[in-house]
Design a protein with these regions (language model features):
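Extracytoplasmic gate region of multi-pass secondary transporters
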Residues: 85-130, 134-138
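C-terminal transmembrane helical hairpin of 12-TM major facilitator-type secondary transporters
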Residues: 150-197
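Juxtamembrane intracellular "pre-TM" segments in multi-pass secondary transporters
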Residues: 66-91
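A late C-terminal transmembrane helix in Major Facilitator Superfamily
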Residues: 206-238
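Interfacial helix-cap and linker-helix signal at transmembrane-aqueous boundaries
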Residues: 30-39, 113-114, 146-147, 232-240
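Multi-pass alpha-helical transporter architecture, strongest
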Residues: 56-65, 248-270
Length: 270
């Protein structure tokens, strides 16, 4: 996406990532309908049906033209150069926190809805993960439309603050309904984090190349795994109190704000 000849790459990056959210919504909705009609016992059949998606993606990807990230005559940064660059490590921290902030709530949203509201898994999936994904996609679509009028740094900082508020709402509110609203609000707040960090990386390290984006994606995936793991670990220590587990996850949006501020300072003195 960063190599495409578009005028505003930040908007394009946000629009691209919004389709991940719409895919998320589709998977939750169709899977919920499958379980509603055929029961959870047949989950293996559903897994086989979903295999069609990556197979089709693989075929389509073979036909996608990919423009080079580095212009002709220039050389990208080596892995060694990246590892010596302070800005790169700040970006890695931001990506890890972006993934963790998103998945720490998303992965537990269905369970939280079932336990907090006492509803069935069907309602829990629709009220939890699907509402989270809809609002996350809406945030990305919003930035893709109005991104040229919005300062990305301020938008990411405001989103991180909103994420902190949503975590507090989920974990401290005495009302299960307000806690569930906090889950949805979290989806809205994390929308810009992942694509925004990619865009900031492209602007900060113009010769980062494919290696940089691959490592940033790896950091994001580590966060996607580490966030829910931390929540689950703390929940177990707190006698299966999921609210306390999610409260521990507030560390990630706080660190993301630290990363955004540190990146601005590092670029100023670079």
């Amino acid at each position: 996406m960063e190599s495409c000849p578009s005028e505003n790459k930040e908007k394009a990056m946000s629009l691209l990532h919004s389709f991940y959210c719409w895919g998320h919504v589709g998977v939750v909705l169709l899977s919920t309908l499958f379980f509603w009609f055929f029961g959870i016992a047949d989950w293996k059949i559903l897994a086989l049906l979903w295999v069609i998606i990556p197979v089709c993606n693989g075929i389509l990807f073979c036909k996608v033209p990919i423009a080079p990230l580095i212009e002709e005559g220039e050389t990208g940064m080596s892995l060694r150069e990246l590892c010596k660059n302070r800005i790169f490590w700040i970006l890695m921290l931001m990506m890890m926190c972006a993934g963790a902030s998103e998945q720490a709530v998303s992965q537990w949203a269905s369970t939280f809805a079932e336990q907090g509201l006492g509803v069935s898994k069907t309602i829990g999936d629709l009220a939890g993960p699907m509402s989270f994904a809809i609002l996350m996609g809406s945030a990305r679509a919003f930035y893709s439309k109005f991104g040229d009028r919005i300062d990305l740094d301020k938008f990411m900082q405001a989103s991180s603050l909103l994420c902190i508020v949503s975590y507090l709402c989920i974990s401290l509110s005495p009302s299960p309904l307000f806690s569930l609203i906090g889950c949805s609000l979290c989806g809205l707040s994390v929308g810009i984090m992942w694509p925004g960090t990619f865009s900031k990386a492209s602007a900060a390290l113009r010769n980062g190349g494919t290696a940089m984006f691959a490592l940033l994606a790896l950091a994001g995936d580590v966060g996607c795994s580490g966030g829910p793991t931390l929540v689950g670990f703390v929940t177990g220590l707190a006698s299966d109190d999921l609210k306390k587990g999610i409260l521990a996850g507030i560390l990630f949006p706080i660190l993301l704000i630290v990363g955004i501020v540190s990146l601005k300072k590092a670029k100023r003195y670079a």
